[in-house]
């Protein structure tokens, strides 16, 4: 159902109304790419066979190339993406490819995101030169910068955002938009803040009903980080990430039944955890 909906809006491009989005936009295309990757995992889990899963993977590969060809552009001097064909002003949604694992233009995109044209004390402007900011794109961006492996940069700006918006003068939740509604929109963006931690810092990616990949991004100043009582994949477990020396990490997973698994890996690498 989700894949069908994303495919529909991929071709029809739902109008955003508040800012121009063109006939096809970067955000919807990137979301559809990630949905195809997830559909491939799901097809395998449901026993649909390798042919179905491989079809989704091939479609994702083709779409990734087309995203680069169609949206890849130099905008305001940055090697990043045009949000839609003909767009020549930086938009916060250039972060979405990073969040979805598309990193061909990560260097220029990260530079643009944290440039004075987009970054403010409240996070990202929706469009360079405007006064509007949507927490949604800021939270996606921080998660995407972690996913791209720029841990120190992501942590620096996560701390800045958190200090201003969680500890400074603020409403006590992530907001839909500003200046629209004067920050009164309580929205699902609060959940996106949590996903910076689970999917950004810890790099959790579901690949099955009882399995996931883990790509931990432990900041250099931290010796360890942990998630306790993760209730997912049909289980209740703790995750502990510890530094084991230069470039080396150790992952300790402990289930609520006391079963423990230990994994050793190099920084930036990915492991698969199976809870079956």
Q: Where in this protein do the model-derived segments appear?
A:
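A short, charged helix-loop
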Residues: 9-18
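Beta-rich accessory regions
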Residues: 49, 55, 62, 70, ...
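Short, well-ordered surface patches within globular domains
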Residues: 65
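A broad structural signal for short, well-ordered beta-strand segments within beta-sheet-rich domains
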Residues: 19, 79-82, 222, 248
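Active-site core of glycosidic bond-cleaving carbohydrate-active enzymes
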Residues: 1-4, 8, 23-54, 58-61, ...
């Amino acid at each position: 159902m989700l894949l069908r909906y994303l495919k529909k809006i991929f071709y029809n491009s739902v109008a955003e109304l508040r800012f121009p989005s063109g006939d096809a936009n970067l955000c919807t295309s990137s979301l559809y790419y990630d949905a195809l990757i997830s559909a491939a995992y799901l097809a395998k889990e449901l026993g649909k066979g390798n042919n179905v899963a491989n079809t989704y993977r091939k479609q994702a590969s083709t779409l990734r190339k087309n995203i680069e060809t169609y949206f890849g552009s130099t905008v305001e001097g940055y090697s990043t993406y045009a949000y839609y064909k003909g767009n020549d002003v930086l938009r916060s949604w250039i972060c979405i490819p990073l969040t979805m694992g598309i990193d061909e233009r990560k260097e220029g995109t990260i530079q643009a995101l944290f440039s004075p044209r987009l970054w403010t004390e409240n996070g990202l402007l929706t469009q360079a030169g405007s006064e509007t900011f949507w927490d949604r794109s800021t939270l996606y961006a921080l998660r995407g910068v972690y996913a791209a492996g720029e841990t120190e940069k992501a942590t620096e700006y996560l701390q800045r955002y958190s200090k201003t918006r969680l500890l400074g003068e603020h409403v006590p939740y992530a907001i839909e938009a500003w200046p629209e509604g004067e920050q009164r929109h309580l929205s699902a963006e609060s959940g996106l803040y949590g996903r910076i931690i689970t999917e950004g810092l810890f790099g959790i990616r579901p690949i099955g009903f009882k399995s996931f990949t883990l790509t931990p991004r432990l900041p250099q100043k931290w010796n360890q980080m942990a998630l306790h009582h993760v209730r997912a994949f049909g289980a209740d477990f703790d995750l502990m990430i510890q530094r084991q020396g230069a470039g080396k990490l150790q992952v300790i997973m402990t289930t609520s039944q006391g079963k423990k698994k230990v994994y050793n890996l190099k920084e930036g690498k990915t492991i698969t955890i199976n809870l079956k």
